[in-house]
C-alpha cells in the first residue's frame, strides 16, 4: 500500500510524469493546522513525509517549487514559544500589541479575530493573526526576521528547490490606519529577495501567491524586479468555463 509521502511521490513522478519537468510540492514541513501552512519547523521534513534525501531525489530529476510561508508561523513554532518566554531567538519576532487601536481598516481574509490574547510571565497583550490564532504573524519591522527568512531561502535553494512561492506575502508589512495589504514596504522586501536570489542562484524563480484584484496582483511584477511569476487565481476556473 502506498503512503502519502515523498517516496511515493518520487515513484509516481518516475512512473507517470516523465514528460513533465516541473512539480510544486505543497508544504511538507511539520505543521499544526491549515493543511500544512502553519509551520512548526522551516528546516525539517515532517516524519510522515520522509526526509531531505527524499526531496533531493525528486529535485535531481524535476524542477521543484516549494512554499515559503513567510507571513506567519505556527503558534507551536519554537520561535513563538521563545517570544512568549522572552528567550532567543524570537523574543522580538512577532507583533506585540496592547490593544486594537488604529486597526479598523485592516483587510481580513478570514473571520477570526485579528488579535489573539497572550498572557505569560513575561508578556501580556495581543499578537497579530491574519489567518488563524494558530498562525501568528511575524514582525518584518525587525531586521532579524528578514535575515532569518533569507537563511531559510538559502537552505531551500541549497537543498535543491528551483522555485519559491511566497505565501500570503501581500499581508507581510503592517502599519496602523492602513489596510495592511500590498504596502510599499512589502514590495521592497520582494525586490530584495528577488535581487538576492538572482545573484546567489541564477535561474531560480520567485513566485508571489497573492489572491487579490488583478491590477494589484500585477504590481508584484514590479519593474521587472520583483516576482518572476505571479498567481492568477481566476485563470483556472475561467479556462474551465471557456472549455465547457
Predicted regions and their residues:
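Short, intrinsically disordered, charge-balanced linker/junction segments flanking boundaries
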Residues: 241-244
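Acidic/aromatic-lined carbohydrate-recognition and catalytic surfaces
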Residues: 1-150, 154, 158, 169-224, ...
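Extended, hydrophobic alpha-helical segments in both membrane/secreted and soluble proteins
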Residues: 164-168
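Catalytic metal-binding acidic patch
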Residues: 228
Amino acid at each position: 500500500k502506498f503512503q502519502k509521502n515523498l517516496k511515493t511521490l518520487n515513484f509516481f513522478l518516475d512512473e507517470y510524469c516523465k514528460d513533465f519537468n516541473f512539480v510544486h510540492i505543497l508544504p511538507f514541513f511539520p505543521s499544526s493546522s491549515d493543511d500544512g501552512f502553519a509551520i512548526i519547523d522551516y528546516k525539517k521534513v515532517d516524519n510522515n513525509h520522509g526526509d531531505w534525501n527524499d526531496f533531493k531525489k525528486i529535485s535531481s530529476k524535476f524542477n521543484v517549487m516549494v512554499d515559503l510561508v513567510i507571513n506567519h508561523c505556527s503558534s507551536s513554532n519554537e520561535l513563538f514559544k521563545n517570544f512568549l518566554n522572552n528567550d532567543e531567538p524570537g523574543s522580538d519576532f512577532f507583533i506585540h500589541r496592547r490593544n486594537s487601536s488604529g486597526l479598523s481598516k485592516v483587510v481580513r481574509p478570514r473571520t477570526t479575530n485579528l488579535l489573539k490574547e497572550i498572557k505569560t510571565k513575561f508578556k501580556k497583550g495581543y499578537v497579530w493573526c491574519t489567518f488563524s490564532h494558530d498562525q501568528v504573524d511575524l514582525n518584518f519591522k525587525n531586521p532579524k526576521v528578514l535575515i532569518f527568512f533569507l537563511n531559510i531561502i538559502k537552505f531551500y535553494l541549497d537543498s535543491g528547490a528551483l522555485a519559491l512561492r511566497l505565501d500570503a506575502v501581500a499581508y507581510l508589512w503592517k502599519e496602523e490606519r492602513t489596510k495592511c495589504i500590498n504596502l510599499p514596504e512589502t514590495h521592497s522586501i520582494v525586490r530584495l529577495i528577488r535581487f538576492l536570489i538572482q545573484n546567489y542562484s541564477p535561474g531560480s524563480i520567485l513566485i508571489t501567491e497573492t489572491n487579490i484584484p488583478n491590477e494589484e496582483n500585477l504590481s508584484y511584477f514590479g519593474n521587472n524586479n520583483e516576482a518572476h511569476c505571479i498567481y492568477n487565481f481566476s485563470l483556472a476556473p475561467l479556462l474551465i468555463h471557456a472549455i465547457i
